[in-house]
Amino acid sequence: MNGLLHMHGPAVKKLLGWKIGEDEEKWCEKAVEALVKKLKKKNNGCGTLEDLECVLANPCTNSRCITIAKSLDGRLQVSHKKGLPHVIYCRVWRWPDISSPHELRSIDTCSYPYESSSKTMYICINPYHYQRLSRPQGLNSSMPSPQPISSPNTIWQSSGSSTASCASSPSPSVFSEDGGEVQVHQRPPPFRHPKSWAQITYFELNSRVGEVFKLVNLSITVDGYTNPSNSNTRICLGQLTNVNRNGTIENTRMHIGKGIQLDNKEDQMHIMITNNSDMPVFVQSKNTNLMMNMPLVKVCRIPPHSQLCVFEFNLFFQMLEQSCNDSDGLNELSKHCFIRISFVKGWGEDYPRQDVTSTPCWLELRLNVPLAYIDQKMKQTPRTNLMEPNSMT
């Protein structure tokens, strides 16, 4: 890198001194150069070039927002690639292996976070105003360089195979190789949504225990405690009884503790799971696996007190659009609307238990809203081998 520094001004050279990692040096230099130009000539927004130098020299979250104006499509072009600004500069100065905006979350004190960037003309690129969420276990710690956005027919396979060909996170993509505007699929025309956005069924091994819980609130906690009061924001598994419960199940239930929190972020078009317990939680979501370019059957481990995006609506709507007039594709897509969550014990190729029904305590989350969109599309599709959607079909 030293051989190239003489080509840049003193501000760029200084900022490059805090760069993390040795990969993609020329791209990082272009990214820093573009940022310096924007910070020098901006008249509005928050934060200066000096503020950026200060926070990089003295890393802390108690620092000013450093903003740049958003482009029409929300992305910043660096050389021949486009990317989300906050991801680009977190990649330069904090985490060179960042591959998706879903791996980042803004801190509470940030005034111009990416999550609310649709409501303002500016976005904060202070790398210390973002926290990194947990990466699903099995995702390489060193991600490859950004690749071209995949073509529509390779984003998802409707043949029922366990893997999908996906060059990058399809929607929204972190980077695209061409300089053009990247299309982000929006929610189709509205229709009458189901009264409950999802429902949860609790299982012990292969037996359902208790009623099916219908979720109306957008945020709900599922824990292992007993709560005699009826609450539509909390499901307490501790009060459910099962005469066939064995010692392994009893021991697992003791470790559920504070459990998980489900958040349907309607404004951000995704669903998050937060693990509030002191034990890991295991999740199988085909939508997440496709988004992370992993086998569709992959089981992700969420460490204690960590989060994972388990459903991305933009990706779903993109796949729904591609499944027009394809009943097999719609049947396959319905499987993406069922998410399995196991407490404490994992399953799959990395664990002794091969199937979720072999885990002591697990949940099935059925997403009613995307299933309703599929049902709406099915009514417009020739009915060949259409099946009632469920997690086992």
From Swiss-Prot:
The keyword Transcription regulation applies. One of its GO terms (biological process) is nematode larval development. Keywords: Cytoplasm, DNA-binding, Metal-binding, Nucleus, Transcription, Transcription regulation, Zinc. It is found in: Cytoplasm; Nucleus. It holds the Pfam family MH1. Its main location: cytoplasm. Residues 141-176 have a biased composition (Low complexity). Disruption phenotype: RNAi-mediated knockdown disrupts tail tip morphogenesis resulting in retention of the pointed larval tail tip in adult males (also known as the Lep phenotype). Changing residue 348 to R: In e491; low-penetrant disruption (57%) of tail tip morphogenesis resulting in retention of the pointed larval tail tip in adult males (also known as the Lep phenotype). This phenotype is enhanced by RNAi against sma-2. SUPFAM superfamilies: SMAD MH1 domain, SMAD/FHA domain. The keyword Signal does not apply. Zn(2+) binds at residues 65, 110, 124, 129. GO terms for cellular component: cytoplasm; heteromeric SMAD protein complex; nucleus. GO terms for molecular function: DNA-binding transcription factor activity, RNA polymerase II-specific; I-SMAD binding; metal ion binding; RNA polymerase II cis-regulatory region sequence-specific DNA binding; transcription coactivator activity. Residues 197-393 form the MH2 domain. Residues 10-139 form the MH1 domain. Residues 136-190 are annotated as: Disordered. Involved in TGF-beta pathway. Plays a role in male tail tip morphogenesis. Belongs to the dwarfin/SMAD family. This is Dwarfin sma-3. It comes from Caenorhabditis elegans. The gene is sma-3.
